[in-house]
């Protein structure tokens, strides 16, 4: 077991523009961290820096309390699993898993023991003599993981390993990865653009945007208390409703640009009169009535999802999505009366986009 530390690391391709801005991350022994963000946010570049495949411009990387910033990849004690399985087509499953150990000069008996144990963990025992072309996508990905496991690394690095699989296989492999981590307890850094993978696999999530770590926290923390407008809009499906407006002069209500006024749960007097963005998740909006002081929304569209439904409407020019129970199926053009609980409202600074 070993920890991983990134200390103020940066990356610049041209010496001027930083594609990774100063970033610090401490990963505890045995912790599973997922880096999630849109394409081009820097997550794969950061992973390659940890692996030693990209040079660190400034800052340091530590693995198992050893500074590895200038070390060759083979000396860092890491093993990578990629999006592409990169299996040798002419080799059997057993030979693919053993190859890395063989070229390092490990003895035949020790190699056989490690391959046998990895195959047992990954339920590949009956497939060891098969070639990659005889395997399904999920089985090939397990072989790629087995090749990493036999190395007994200090840190696993996963670069979007499930993105080539179909939806059903991705669900299965997510469960297998969770079970694998519980069994091995190896420190892991995992890259994905898929927020479902991030939320289900991670002990902590690092949400990245434009080379910056917007927020680092548990899946529950980043979902329930997003640190910025970006995190609020990226995490959650459908995304959090974000509504522009201002805090009234008394700091007691939020005035939407569409003329709707919503009560605030106190503590916002210091923001009186300021432009802000209000956020609320679709599932936190409750149906109410006009008599109960509900806020009206004319529904444009209803998405029927099976377990629940999504009602889409507008307040002025601003879109609003409401998650409804599966038996609630209003028709387009009907008016919904809504209650937005004060304790479920989020406020973000109108200039910085940061949570207040």
Curated annotation (Swiss-Prot):
Keywords: ATP-binding, Cell inner membrane, Cell membrane, Membrane, Nucleotide-binding, Sugar transport, Translocase, Transport. PROSITE patterns: ABC_TRANSPORTER_1, ABC_TRANSPORTER_2, UGPC. This is sn-glycerol-3-phosphate import ATP-binding protein UgpC. It catalyses: sn-glycerol 3-phosphate(out) + ATP + H2O = sn-glycerol 3-phosphate(in) + ADP + phosphate + H(+). Part of the ABC transporter complex UgpBAEC involved in sn-glycerol-3-phosphate (G3P) import. Responsible for energy coupling to the transport system. Its main location: membrane. The complex is composed of two ATP-binding proteins (UgpC), two transmembrane proteins (UgpA and UgpE) and a solute-binding protein (UgpB). Its EC number is 7.6.2.10. Coiled coil: none annotated. GO terms for biological process: carbohydrate transport; glycerophosphodiester transmembrane transport. Residues 4-235 form the ABC transporter domain. Belongs to the ABC transporter superfamily. sn-glycerol-3-phosphate importer (TC 3.A.1.1.3) family. ATP binds at residues 37-44. One of its GO terms (molecular function) is ABC-type glycerol-3-phosphate transporter activity. SUPFAM superfamilies: MOP-like, P-loop containing nucleoside triphosphate hydrolases. It is a peripheral membrane protein. It is found in: Cell inner membrane. GO terms for cellular component: ATP-binding cassette (ABC) transporter complex, substrate-binding subunit-containing.
């Amino acid at each position: 077991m070993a920890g991983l530390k990134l200390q103020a690391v940066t990356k610049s391709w041209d010496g001027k523009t930083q594609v990774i801005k100063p970033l610090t991350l401490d990963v505890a022994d045995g912790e599973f961290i997922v880096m999630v963000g849109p394409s081009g946010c820097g997550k794969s570049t950061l992973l390659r820096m940890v692996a030693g495949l990209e040079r660190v411009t400034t800052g340091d990387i530590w693995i198992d309390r050893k500074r590895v910033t200038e070390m060759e990849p083979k000396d860092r004690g890491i093993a990578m699993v990629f999006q592409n399985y990169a299996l040798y087509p002419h080799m059997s499953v057993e030979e693919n898993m053993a190859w890395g150990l063989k070229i390092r000069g490990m003895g035949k008996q020790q190699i056989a023991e490690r391959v046998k144990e990895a195959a047992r963990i990954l339920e590949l025992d009956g497939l060891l003599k098969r070639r990659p072309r005889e395997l399904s996508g999920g089985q090939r990905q397990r072989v790629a993981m087995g090749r990493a496991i036999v190395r007994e690394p200090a840190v696993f690095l996963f670069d979007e390993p499930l993105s080539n699989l179909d939806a059903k296989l991705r669900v299965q492999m997510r469960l297998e990865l969770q079970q694998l981590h519980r069994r091995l307890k190896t420190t892991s850094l995992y890259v994905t653009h898929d927020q479902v993978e991030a939320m289900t696999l991670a002990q902590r999530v690092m949400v990245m945007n434009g080379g910056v770590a917007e927020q680092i926290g548990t899946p529950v923390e980043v979902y329930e208390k997003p640190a910025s407008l970006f995190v609020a809009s990226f995490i959650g499906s459908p995304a959090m409703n974000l509504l522009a407006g201002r805090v009234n002069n008394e700091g007691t209500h939020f005035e939407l640009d569409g003329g709707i006024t919503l009560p605030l749960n106190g503590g916002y007097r210091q923001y009186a009169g300021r432009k802000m963005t209000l956020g609320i998740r679709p599932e936190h909006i409750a149906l109410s009535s006009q008599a109960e002081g509900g806020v009206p929304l004319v529904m444009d569209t209803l998405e029927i999802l099976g377990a629940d439904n999504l009602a889409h409407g507008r307040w002025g020019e601003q879109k609003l999505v409401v998650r409804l129970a599966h038996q609630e199926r209003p028709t387009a053009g009907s008016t919904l009366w809504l209650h937005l609980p004060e304790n479920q409202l989020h406020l973000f600074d109108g200039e910085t986009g940061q949570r207040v």
